[in-house]
Amino acid sequence: MSINNKQWLGLPLNLLWGYIAIAVFMTGDGFELAFLSHYIKALGFSPAEASFAFTLYGLAAALSAWISGVVAEIITPLKTMMIGFVLWCVFHVLFLVFGLGHANYALILPFYGIRGLAYPLFLYSFIVAIIHNVRSDSSSSALGWFWAVYSVGIGVFGSYIPSFTIPHIGEMGTLWLALLFCATGGIIALVSMRHTETPRHMQNLTTREKFAELGRAATLLYTNRSILFSSIVRIINTLSLFGFAVIMPMMFVDELGFTTSEWLQVWAAFFFTTIFSNVFWGIVAEKMGWMKVIRWFGCIGMALSSLAFYYLPQHFGHNFAMALVPAIALGIFVAAFVPMAAVFPALEPNHKGAAISVYNLSAGLSNFLAPAIAVVLLPYFSTIGVVIAYTALYILAFFLCPLIRVEQPGFTSDQHAKPFTANAAES
């Protein structure tokens, strides 16, 4: 298949509307992220019960993310995205009507949990389309744009819009509005990606061979040591993102006196920053080296900014301006992990779909483990215990990075050597 090289600052123009679809869909999916845990608590459930709902959701998302890369290669990214789209809409309605609508915890868990299967199928399948439609030496910047539009959706619009709608139509009205955004994003993807090409060799495999390829998404973890270490680093990458969304509303709103709208605007500032930092680090990593950016700016930056996200608000109290400082810092450094999405397929060039599935599984496990750590530590060590745990794990990732041996397109096997010619790097 041919690769379209038309780009704008690393954005592949042939996939432009796919990027827009991701932004719109994830806007709807992101509405709940920064207020749902507090809303579930307001319905009469404990903080641990609210966190457990997110933990179950994260587990479902991890399982779905694990298979999404291989499934997207076998049945095409578009079909996989459509399965995720329909699943999201159906179980979101069930979650609102029978779960939250009746404050029924026994129904909140299964409907919200099953809905967790949906967004990874829609979101991560698009990574397969990117990997197969851009040159490998340009994949870091293309994936930077992917995470940028993800941030536009789930973080910026997903946080700012609820901060204005909740005072007028309430939490439930805002959650119903989310359905409109997700439906629009799904329709945009359906229309715009009908002719997006992906290699067809996986689609012609026998059923047995397809299951074998699906299994490879797990076996790579012990057959390729660099994949294993990369997976651990990717899991650690977004612990603060998913964990702070669960624990920080309780600290900011219940303890420090912020309104829900103020907290949502602080959280949106974090995501707004990542729009630019995702693109920035994607481009920088192609010049400086993937692992160098991940290790020194991602791991160290996130360790420090995670601590700041707790200590600065605790010191200054209900001070909106000072609360923005650690939020912006967190947004700058979490994006330094963007090259991880390019590292995985580079480690397994003959099984890119399986490698991407491991990457997606790792992202999903991060979604699962972040609130799980909170569930375990909150009753004993409060918010600070959770923050310190996340910080320690970022330091662990710093020491794991040198163990990942990846040959970056555009570089010789020595990552510190000068880039060789672009022609030699093309896939």
Descriptions of predicted regions:
Residues 1-12, 195-231, 420-427:
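Juxtamembrane intracellular "pre-TM" segments in multi-pass secondary transporters
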Residues 23, 105-121, 320-335:
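Hydrophobic core of transmembrane alpha-helices in multi-pass small-molecule transporters
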Residues 34-48, 246-262:
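Short amphipathic helix-loop junctions that connect adjacent transmembrane helices
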Residues 64-76, 278-290, 378:
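Helix-to-loop junctions at the C-terminal end of transmembrane segments
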Residues 74-85, 287-300:
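Cytoplasmic membrane-interface "Motif A"-like loop-to-helix N-cap segments
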Residues 86-102, 300-316:
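C-terminal ends and interior cores of transmembrane alpha-helices
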Residues 111-149:
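Cytoplasmic helix-loop-helix junction between adjacent transmembrane helices
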Residues 350-380:
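A late C-terminal transmembrane helix in Major Facilitator Superfamily
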